[in-house]
Every structure is written in C-alpha cells, then in structure tokens.
Amino acid sequence: MRRGDVFIADLIPRSGSEQTGRRPVVIISNDGFNLTQNWRSIIVVPLSTSTSQALRTQTAVMIPQGEAGLSQDSVALCHQVTTLDRSKLKNRLGELTQAKMLEIERGLKAAMDLI
C-alpha cells in the first residue's frame, strides 16, 4: 500500500457528518509509514459519489469514473482527512495519477489553511 493508492475501506464507526460505511479512500500518508508493517495507522481522504460536493468548496477534488479503478465519478473530501487502522482497508482499486495527487495536496492545504 502506497501514497495515492485507492482502497475500499470500512469507515465504521463514525458519527455526525463524517463519511461512513464501506467506501473508497485514497491513501495520503508518507510511504515510509505505509510500507512499515508494524505501523498500523494510515492517513486517508474519503471519497464520495455525491459530485455536487465538488462545487461547494476548494477542498473537494473531482475524480472521474475509471481513474484508479473507480466505478463512478467521485469526489475526494480533503476536509474530512482521517486516520484508520490498516485492517480497515479491504481491497485495492488502483492508483491515482501524480497530477490528481497534486490536486488533492492543494485541497488538503486549503482545508488546513497551509496555503
């Protein structure tokens, strides 16, 4: 598992407006952590198929159907970045392009006011 990989993850339990259920996520944590088997925590951005969210904020990044194995148009919700135990990651769908990862990095910077 590497930075930019898209996995199906079990986001349960969650509460409030957090993304929940079984859904795709993109790994954003450093590969130094990702490739260390004893390191259990993985930092991810959840994806949603509610593409109208992409119009609401600069922290949402559109990912078209087919990219990274996604079966539907999706939106990376950079404002909902979260940490998961790697056991919650189920099957790998694919990998985002470097260009798409740069868009996600910009979304993360906007979400955390790092611009």
Where are these regions (language model features)?
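Conserved functional hotspots at enzyme active or ligand-binding sites that engage polyanionic ligands
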Residues: M1-I115
